[in-house]
């Protein structure tokens, strides 16, 4: 299966609110028809207030996230200050575009979640064609098709962290109900003025305990 085909069978979800941005990703890692592990962390901490969620083959996603993280750290060491979220997204998009033009594209789709003191929560959606857009909410993969209507219905920029987490739980529950793919576990992280925080994993047991 091609790398972009693999990314479509994975899922990324994101919500941007006034004081934070929350993203979730499935934790399934497969090779052909074999499940390698179901606790993969696809949400990578790039800096103190920046998370990057990536879909694609394990090699591409890990290598690209580390490439971005190390270059951002190098920039901070050289210049004495770090890049803001918009600048990191611009750097990421340029590298995706350069790879695409070179004939050896980086086959990853991603969500970039960040927090800036002036802008508040920020969410960007990027794909392997280097298309980039700032969005209030986003979803990648076939599973995301079941979630866009839920996000559109319940999204508000004034949501609190518990409320946004509940919206993501609704999305995951619909994925479990409607999608034939096995995506049982979703990791969730939130970035705010306090930094990056990991929230409880959303899985089938979450909904059993909620009853």
What are these regions (language model features)?
Residues 1-211:
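Long, low-complexity N-terminal extensions
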